[in-house]
């Protein structure tokens, strides 16, 4: 058996022990605990990852302590049975229940500390420095987020009586259209505590721990409100219910539904912001909890033009406004991330020219006082046959970045979003959503 097999078998046996323990079948539970601990010990022995090893060790200790407690109880029960009547033995289960509750109270604080420690990395202590103006287009989505996030914090007196800010927003659309980037802008612009989590932060291999993580996440958000919980790829946690769904997945979904509903808690001041590429796979109950469902489509011409300008930034180039509009027109069907890839490739074209050049020539710099070498054609006046390895660092001038570099990059970079996916997104928008442009 591999390490994963030992761990899976150990968790299976320990879960059986927990179920028996809960049902007060302590003798069977004790045996199951020790059978499971044998496998966890083997998993611990062969596990190579230090973090996984620490987690297995902590769980091993926790279950070992419980098994030892059951052992003491069973020994005590046997001793009592020898001295007392059978009726006295029936009362011992009640005593054991009390012991279990006390143990839960003692360990509850420690467990919560561990869970909060695991979630601490989800809190963004430093703002990502992405402003609203850094997000090209998507004016509808930005206005919705300002209404839900900025206004309630800045003007709380506007939200009284039945006028309450939105508590759940779902951003959906094809991959690479800026959903996570919008979330970064929210984190920068909002004067709120920002929790950024994905399914990997909330799903645990240990039975019952995932729903505890969800509960603690919302508890931390309520303690630090105003706050925003951003769940990236929310579909991984809240897919459609079906026969193939695991019990663990159902419990996570149920806990998330309870927390988003705010049952038994004051959740005002907590916004849940979800992002997904496949909204049609969301469970209908979860979909309903997101009061606003905003479609983040592929960028239009104006947005694509702006994206080229933003991605080029302050890199030296000779592109004009008309050149940027041309590039925007040529990239219809490209997502924001596709355009970022195009620009990245184009920015490397001058470097590739340097690497492949066989001739260089002298050119003047902006101050006209120094001369530098730049790649050229062998037929150019003043061309010197040499390689870039023959040139000192302060003597080299990279070629100008031109629209030709971008045209070459566009030819080699195809859009990643297909027509079928867009049709599904548009159908979902007609059925359940609203446009983000």
UniProtKB/Swiss-Prot annotation:
Belongs to the AAA ATPase family. InterPro entries: AAA+_ATPase (IPR003593), AAA_lid_3 (IPR041569), ATPase_AAA_core (IPR003959), ATPase_AAA_CS (IPR003960), MIT_dom (IPR007330), MIT_dom_sf (IPR036181), MT-severing_AAA_ATPase (IPR050304), P-loop_NTPase (IPR027417). The keyword Transcription does not apply. It is a peripheral membrane protein. Residues 74-114, 364-384, 418-437 are annotated as: Disordered. The lineage of its organism: Eukaryota, Fungi, Dikarya, Ascomycota, Saccharomycotina. Residues 421-437 have a biased composition (Basic and acidic residues). GO terms for cellular component: ATPase complex; cytoplasm; endoplasmic reticulum; endosome; ESCRT IV complex; membrane; midbody; nuclear pore. GO terms for biological process: autophagosome maturation; autophagy; endosomal transport; intralumenal vesicle formation; late endosome to lysosome transport via multivesicular body sorting pathway; late endosome to vacuole transport; late endosome to vacuole transport via multivesicular body sorting pathway; macroautophagy. One of its GO terms (molecular function) is ATP hydrolysis activity. Present with 5350 molecules/cell in log phase SD medium. It comes from the Eukaryota. Residues 82-98 have a biased composition (Low complexity). Disulfide bonds: none annotated. This is Vacuolar protein sorting-associated protein 4. Involved in the transport of biosynthetic membrane proteins from the prevacuolar/endosomal compartment to the vacuole. Required for multivesicular body (MVB) protein sorting. Catalyzes the ATP-dependent dissociation of class E VPS proteins from endosomal membranes, such as the disassembly of the ESCRT-III complex. The gene is VPS4. It holds the Pfam family MIT. SMART domains: AAA, MIT. It is found in: Endosome membrane.
């Amino acid at each position: 058996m591999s390490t994963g097999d030992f761990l899976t078998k150990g968790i299976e046996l320990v879960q059986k022990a927990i179920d028996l323990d809960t049902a007060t079948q302590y003798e069977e539970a004790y045996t199951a605990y020790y059978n499971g601990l044998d496998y966890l010990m083997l998993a611990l022995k062969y596990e190579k990852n230090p973090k996984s090893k620490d987690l297995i060790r902590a769980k091993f200790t926790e279950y070992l302590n419980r098994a030892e407690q059951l052992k003491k109880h069973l020994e005590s029960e046997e001793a009592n049975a020898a001295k007392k009547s059978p009726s006295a033995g029936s009362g011992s289960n009640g005593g054991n229940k009390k012991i279990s509750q006390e143990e839960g109270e003692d360990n509850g604080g420690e467990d919560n500390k561990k869970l909060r420690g695991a979630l601490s990395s989800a809190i963004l202590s430093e703002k990502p420095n992405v402003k609203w103006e850094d997000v090209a287009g998507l004016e509808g989505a930005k206005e919705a987020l300002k209404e839900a996030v900025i206004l309630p914090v800045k003007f709380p007196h506007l939200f009284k009586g039945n006028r309450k800010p939105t508590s759940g927003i779902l951003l959906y659309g094809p991959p690479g259209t800026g959903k996570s980037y919008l979330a970064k802008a929210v984190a920068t612009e909002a004067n709120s505590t920002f929790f950024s989590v994905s399914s990997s932060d909330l799903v645990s291999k240990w039975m019952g721990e995932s729903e505890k993580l969800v509960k603690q996440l919302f508890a931390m958000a309520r303690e630090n409100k105003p706050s925003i919980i951003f769940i990236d790829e929310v579909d991984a946690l809240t897919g459609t219910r079906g026969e193939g769904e695991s019990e663990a997945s159902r419990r996570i979904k149920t806990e998330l539904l309870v927390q988003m509903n705010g049952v038994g808690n004051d959740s005002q001041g907590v916004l849940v912001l979800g992002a997904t590429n496949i909204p049609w796979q969301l469970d209908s109950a979860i979909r309903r909890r997101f009061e606003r469902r905003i479609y983040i489509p592929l960028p239009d011409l104006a947005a694509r033009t702006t994206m080229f300008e933003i991605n080029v930034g302050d890199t030296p180039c000779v592109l004009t406004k008309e050149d940027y509009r041309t590039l925007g027109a040529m990239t219809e069907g490209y997502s924001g991330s596709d355009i970022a890839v195009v620009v990245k490739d184009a920015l490397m074209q001058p470097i590739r020219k340097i690497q492949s050049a066989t001739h260089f020539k002298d050119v003047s710099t902006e101050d006209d006082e120094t001369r530098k070498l730049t790649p050229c054609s062998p037929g150019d006046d003043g061309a010197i046959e040499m390689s870039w390895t023959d040139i000192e660092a302060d003597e080299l001038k990279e070629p100008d970045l031109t629209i030709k570099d971008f045209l070459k990059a566009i030819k080699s970079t195809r859009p990643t979003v297909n027509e079928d996916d867009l049709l599904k997104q548009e159908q979902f928008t007609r059925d359940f959503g609203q446009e983000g442009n």
